[in-house]
Amino acid sequence: MKTLIRKFSRTAITVVLVILAFIAIFNAWVYYTESPWTRDARFSADVVAIAPDVSGLITQVNVHDNQLVKKGQVLFIIDQPRYQKALEEAQADVAYYQVLAQEKRQEAGRRNRLGVQAMSREEIDQANNVLQTVLHQLAKAQATRDLAKLDLERTVIRAPADGWVTNLNVYTGEFITRGSTAVALVKQNSFYVLAYMEETKLEGVRPGYRAEITPLGSNKVLKGTVDSVAAGVTNASSTRDDKGMATIDSNLEWVRLAQRVPVRIRLDNQQENIWPAGTTATVVVTGKQDRDESQDSFFRKMAHRLREFG
């Protein structure tokens, strides 16, 4: 009888342990697969594509690749002598038309004072018309001068914000055309994370929720806040034919891949971010509050580590 009880006890204990292990593993698996997290996340930043508004030879390059620059700092200079001459020519035209307008104004005023008693109405109208024509030419010359002044100012290309010069591909002596991108500027303190969350995990993602960001290959955990969730993504399975009818791609009903939706996360401390834009990371949305590691169970800690390195 005792032997039977002993065997039964061992069997019961084994079954209980197996059930507990199964429950623990199942909970860990659910936590790992269904809670809001993703390894498909990337550091991003605001990037300004800097292109000149004038064409000409590059006469001076004042920066080097990956240099940190301040707002207003000169990056490079384009053929100033040519645009200086254009400004001087425009200024001369303005001076000429100012003198001419003064002469025509005096002539028209004299004829208007004398009136039809001294000359015909046609001569008076002609003087007034000539004055108006000269005034229009003066206005055009002034606009040309202002444009030449603006072009001269824009021969000096300055940094629009604090940031890092990257992909610098211009050199002294090269000819650059208006509108062609010369360099990219990664704005300082503009870094954020784009986490591509599966649609099945969006239930636990809300603006204002806290998030943990672990860069690939690093144990350092950065903190952030969910800033926004994208309002839509492209439907790759639906297109239009040449008649405007919808074309829907066939799919397997028992295999449905979850769509990924971009979630923008704002970093708490910009100064601590040393990861370039475009590098990858793991993101875990912890909810309204930061995760308290001291209260995590062993399985949750293991699941969290799997997220980072799995």
From Swiss-Prot:
Query: Which is a Gene Ontology cellular component entry for this protein?
Result: plasma membrane
Domain of life, per UniProt, equals: Bacteria
* Xref: SUPFAM superfamilies: HlyD-like secretion proteins
Q: Where in the cell is it found?
A: Cell inner membrane
**One Pfam family of this protein, by short name?**
HlyD_D23
Main location (coarse class): membrane
Membrane association type: Single-pass membrane protein
UniProt keywords (A-Z) are: Cell inner membrane, Cell membrane, Membrane, Transmembrane, Transmembrane helix, Transport
Q: What drives induction of this protein's expression? A: Positively coregulated with aaeB and aaeX by AaeR.
List GO molecular-function terms, semicolon-separated: transmembrane transporter activity
Q: Which stretches are transmembrane? A: 12-32
Q: What does this protein do?
A: Forms an efflux pump with AaeB.
NCBIfam families, sorted: PRK10559.1, RND_mfp
Membership in a protein family: Belongs to the membrane fusion protein (MFP) (TC 8.A.1) family.
Supply the name of the protein.
Answer: p-hydroxybenzoic acid efflux pump subunit AaeA
Organism field: Escherichia coli O7:K1 (strain IAI39 / ExPEC)
